[in-house]
């Protein structure tokens, strides 16, 4: 998880998540953390299952999204994905006001993956309209399930 000086100023992940509080609240996440002798709670970032659980937990905690993150596919790092969308939002804010007043922001995520991370975040957090496309039938099926599970299927079409 990239938590550094290059994070967007409005990115809540500029301050690292509190793994200890997350472990108390989310029992699935608790299974993947260990407390060291100083009391610091740590996650094994080399473990794909731990990373998938971290992503799932952050989706729920910070965006109220219930997302299946298969540990066998690409596991999105939410801080960097949100960072990208915040920079896009900044770019959109530079457009003349009359160009953005009546226009709805629409985006296309080519290769959306199983989590459909950009469409889910853009729709839920920013209120944008997104289309996700995916070549892998397995990833597309999971992406569609993730969109439907969050009752966004009318707002986030997904296709091959």
Question: Model-found features: residue ranges?
Answer:
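Conserved class I S-adenosyl-L-methionine
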Residues: 100-113, 129-131
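S-adenosyl-L-methionine
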Residues: 135-160
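Conserved SAM-binding loop of SAM-dependent methyltransferases across substrates and taxa
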Residues: 114-128
């Amino acid at each position: 998880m990239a938590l550094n000086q290059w994070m967007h100023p409005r990115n809540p992940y500029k301050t690292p998540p509190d793994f200890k509080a997350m472990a108390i609240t989310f029992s699935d996440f608790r299974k993947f953390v260990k407390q060291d002798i100083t009391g610091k709670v740590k996650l094994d970032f080399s473990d794909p299952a731990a990373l998938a659980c971290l992503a799932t937990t952050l989706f729920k905690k910070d965006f109220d999204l219930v997302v299946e993150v298969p540990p066998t596919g690409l596991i999105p790092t939410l801080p960097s994905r949100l960072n990208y969308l915040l920079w896009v939002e900044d770019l959109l804010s530079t457009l003349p006001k009359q160009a953005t007043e009546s226009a709805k922001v629409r985006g296309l995520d080519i290769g959306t993956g199983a989590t459909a991370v950009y469409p889910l975040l853009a729709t839920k957090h920013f209120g944008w309209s997104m289309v996700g496309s995916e070549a892998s039938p397995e990833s597309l099926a999971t992406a569609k399930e993730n969109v439907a599970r969050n009752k966004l299927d009318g707002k986030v079409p997904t296709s091959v």
